Each structure stands twice: as structure tokens, then as C-alpha cells.
Amino acid sequence: MDFRTYLKRYPDKNGRFGQYGGAYLTNELIPAFEEIADAYQTICHSSQFISELRRIRKEFQGRPTPVYHCERLSRAIGNCQIYLKREDLNHTGAHKLNHCMGEGLLAKFMGKKRLIAETGAGQHGVALATAAAFFGLECEIHMGEVDIAKQAPNVTRMKILGAKVVPVTHGLKTLKEAVDSAFDSYAKNYKDSIYCIGSALGPHPFPLMVRDFQAVVGYEAKDQFKEMTGFLPDVVTACVGGGSNAAGMFIPFLEEPVDIIGIEPLGRGEKLGDHAASMKYGEKGVMHGFESIMLKDKNGNPAPVYSIASGLDYPSVGPEHAFLRELGRVDYKVINDEEAMEAFFKLSRYEGIIPAIESSHAVAYAMKKAKEMKQGSILVCLSGRGDKDIDYVVEHYGYGEQYFK
């Protein structure tokens, strides 16, 4: 595979990344998603759209976000140097706003009046509510009851921003069910609404759109790292639930001699229902309108999943990630709850940066890998900040003293 031409070849015109991707939709929804795909290909490549998105990123989002060298954390581990791409400093505190502003701008150009989406940890919901307020659009966010309880600050933010938060009370009451609920609502309202998927998954064109809007993260990081150090990192890593921050981080490095590692949540362990590590334990399947690797129960349905990180507990992964693993270009590893929480507290104490629990999975892998490497450099996408998590963390883990004995 020549990765210098990869972006021109994938996805193909049908939204396929090799055997993954596509659009598996009801007859009712096919024209709605075709409308979005056609609009994306025409509107989003226009000079007017690109110019406006650049202005928004600079003036509203505060981009570019910096790359930061974790000197104290690196020193505590050894000689390998850990760097962070600080998406926690993007407006609203996570990478999610990168694609939400793009989707909101697209909706505005298309003449839609409402944004509909699901959210897990609440960061996508907050980002989309922010985009809706910015563009003067209505916003409807579907969120599982379990996540509403865990992520109360983000629920409050969404409501302050004017969004309607719809509690989802069926099934496990988490991210997968929230997607189901949002899909149902969109099916009834697609003529005046746009569905804004929260990750690099779903029916075509969303894996493509979200990847393209998020790629600003990797392009910035690549240039910034080279400017800081004079070379490329040895390893690039990011957490993977659906895979939006990872897709944005990885794409610009595909053609470079860099190891690229996605980190999935192992949760409490290997037993089905105790983790959300789709790539490690899943198999090919179709869910939520796209084909990828997914966790299945004994009946072939989406399996119950768990992660301490609400934004990672999804039983599948974006189709491009499945394809990149198949090509052998990106490897995928797992980190459990305990390892993620140790990284959460150590980054907080050593660097004064409180990370999102989702991002802590990638930091945990970087810490583990740094011990093995002994030298060189690792660049981590710190996808978000941990403000949303602190009440939950203190209730279940205290203030982290156990990690510093």
C-alpha cells in the first residue's frame, strides 16, 4: 500500500474502506444520507466553506492547539520522552468540536434547522450544542441514563447552551442505545435536520467527514513536533472508542516511518461484557448502518460492553480503523481501567494536566511503552480534559494517593 495516495483512494465512492464501511440503511433513510454525501462533496470542498471553517477554527476554537513536552512524567519513567497534542485546550475541552463545527457549518449551508446526535461522555453533546448555538440551530442530544448520571456537568452545559437532552432508558442505557434513539429521531425528522454522528463511524459519508474534519489535529501535531524537535516521533498513539480523535491524529502520519498505535478499553477484564475492545475480541458485522469489527453476543447481536470511560464503551469501531489494521499499518492495544486511572492521576500530579478518562487510556499506553523503549519519543493525542470526570473519580478512586506509595 502506497500511503502517499491513500486519502485519494479511500473510502471509495460507496464509502468502503476495503471490505468495511458502506451505508446499510432503510429505504426511508437512503435519500437523507445521499443528500448529506452529495452536499459534503460539493459544499465542503468549496473555497467559501474552507475559508469560513479556517476562520472558525482560529477565532472561535482557539486553534492550533499546542504540542506539550511532559518532561517531569518522562523523567519519572526513564529516558523516553512523552509529548501531548493538547486537544483538551480546544474550545469545550475536547477534540469533538473539530467535527461538530464542520457538521454545523454544513447543516447551515444545506438550509437545515436542527442538529440531532448521540453522546456518551457528553463531550460530543456539548460540542454539538456549542455548534448549534454558534450557527443559530436547534439541537437534540440523545444520552443514556447511566451516562447522564456519570456526566452531570456535561448535561448541565448542554442545557445551558440550549440543547434538548433526551434520556435513553432502554437496554444498558449507554452509548449504543443513545445511537439507536438518535437514529430513530432522525428517521422522523431528516427533512429539516442533519444527523451529526459523534465519531468516525456510521453510514457513509460520516466516517469520511469526521476523519477529514479531525485531520487538522494530526496535521498540526506533525508540523509542531518537527518544529519542536527537528524530527518525527517514534510512536503516535490515541484512544479508540469509535475512533474520531485517533483517525484525525493518525491520518497525517500514515506515510511516515512512525509506529501508530490505537488504544482500546479493556475495562475490568477479558470477559464479554467487561470491556469494549472491539478490535481485540470482535468479528466482522453490521451495526448502526456500517460494516466493521464489532463485539457480538451468542446470538450475533451487538454485545453488552463496559468501560470506565463513557466515551469508549461502544461495541464496534470506525471502519477505517478496521481497514488500517487489516493493512498492517496501525496496531491496536488494550488498557484496563486500573492502568487508565493510574495514568489519570500521574499526569495530573506530574504535569498539572487533568486528562479525560478516555484520553488516560492513551497516556497509560505511552507510560507503559516508554518503559519498554528506554529512549526515543511518543506523541499522544490528549483528546480531552477531565473536568467532566472528577466527581466520579473522587467517589470511586479518592484523590489517587494509592498510585504514589
UniProtKB/Swiss-Prot annotation:
The gene is trpB. Tetramer of two alpha and two beta chains. The keyword Lyase applies. Its EC number is 4.2.1.20. This is Tryptophan synthase beta chain. The modification N6-(pyridoxal phosphate)lysine is found at residue 96. The beta subunit is responsible for the synthesis of L-tryptophan from indole and L-serine. Belongs to the TrpB family. HAMAP family: Trp_synth_beta. GO terms for molecular function: tryptophan synthase activity. Its cofactor is pyridoxal 5'-phosphate. InterPro entries: Trp_synth_b_CS (IPR006653), Trp_synth_beta (IPR006654), Trp_synth_beta/beta-like (IPR023026), TrpB-like_PALP (IPR001926), TrpB-like_PALP_sf (IPR036052).
